[in-house]
Amino acid sequence: MEEVLKLKIPASTANLGVGFDSIGMALDKYLHMSIRKIERSNWEFLYYSSELEGLPKDENNYIYQTALNVAHKYNVTLPSLQIEMRSDIPLARGLGSSASALVGALFIANYFGNIQLSKYELLQLATEIEGHPDNVAPTIYGGLIAGFYNPITKITDVARIEVPHVDIILTIPPYELRTEDSRRVLPDTFSHKGAVQNSAISNTMICALIQHKYKLAGKMMEQDGFHEPYRQHLIPEFNQVRKLSRQHDAYATVISGAGPTILTLCPKEKSGKLVRTLREKINNCASELVTINEIGVKDEVVYLKS
């Protein structure tokens, strides 16, 4: 019998406006992976979607490098593997594609190296590699999660928030925006006054989400001062999306992660009309309704006749 590990890894949206590098939510767009042992000296990567075209298929592959680094960390040896991949998560669009790949690599190393890492340990490892938990935490656990990574202790603490009862619209531009380029425009420091103000806005947003006060939560999301004022000019469609969304009584329109994808939270009774309007008025972008993934990574092992 041939043993195949199957992974279904969700996309994620980070920040929700003012929750910079600390808040994220899993979405129902996925990286699918099927992994099996092969009798070869090298790993084999097979891609079955346009989103993955151009990615390395040799030792420069990020999943390969990460899995081997984890195996080395725990003093185990991984067999040669064949990894089949398909994805509907666009690359470099602010939807956690790199976090999904990272989490996939950790699950691969954990299973085929028989390391026996718990989900908590997988989170610690993922955050240490990524530097912040905003994408990897919801990717692993699902739902809406706030977290803090302490770079001194290398410990990540997270708390799960009930997912908002709203509809989610993604407006995905046709161009990429690399995280490193998007981070380059951010200031190195903030004044004490500015930090206090943004902390207050973030705290209020969290409380409003917990209390299902989505108008208040949205008001706070749109007052971010940590990153959005510096990044909006990189996304020409942003202001028009926010304007149209407000005309349809949306709760908030913010940048998803580092962008360029634009995230809109909308009342369920308004979302259909809004997404159709966005498709009509901003037709160079792909606007779509998505739902929140609440379970995180789905992994299963299947056995096939050889």
Swiss-Prot record:
UniProt: ATP binding residues: 90-100
Sorted UniProt keywords: Amino-acid biosynthesis, ATP-binding, Cytoplasm, Kinase, Nucleotide-binding, Threonine biosynthesis, Transferase
Catalytic activity of the protein: L-homoserine + ATP = O-phospho-L-homoserine + ADP + H(+)
EC number: 2.7.1.39
Chief localisation class: cytoplasm
GO cellular component, one term: cytoplasm
The organism's place on the tree of life at top rank: Bacteria
Any one GO molecular-function label of the UniProt entry: homoserine kinase activity
UniProt subcellular location: Cytoplasm
Enzyme superclass (EC): transferase
Alphabetized InterPro entries for the sequence: GHMP_kinase_C_dom, GHMP_kinase_C_sf, GHMP_kinase_N_dom, GHMP_knse_ATP-bd_CS, Homoserine_kinase, Ribosomal_Su5_D2-typ_SF, Ribsml_uS5_D2-typ_fold_subgr
Annotated GO biological process: threonine biosynthetic process
Pathway in which this enzyme or protein is active: Amino-acid biosynthesis; L-threonine biosynthesis; L-threonine from L-aspartate: step 4/5
The protein's role, per its UniProt record: Catalyzes the ATP-dependent phosphorylation of L-homoserine to L-homoserine phosphate.
Protein family: Belongs to the GHMP kinase family. Homoserine kinase subfamily.
Protein name, per record: Homoserine kinase
Native source species: Staphylococcus epidermidis (strain ATCC 12228 / FDA PCI 1200)
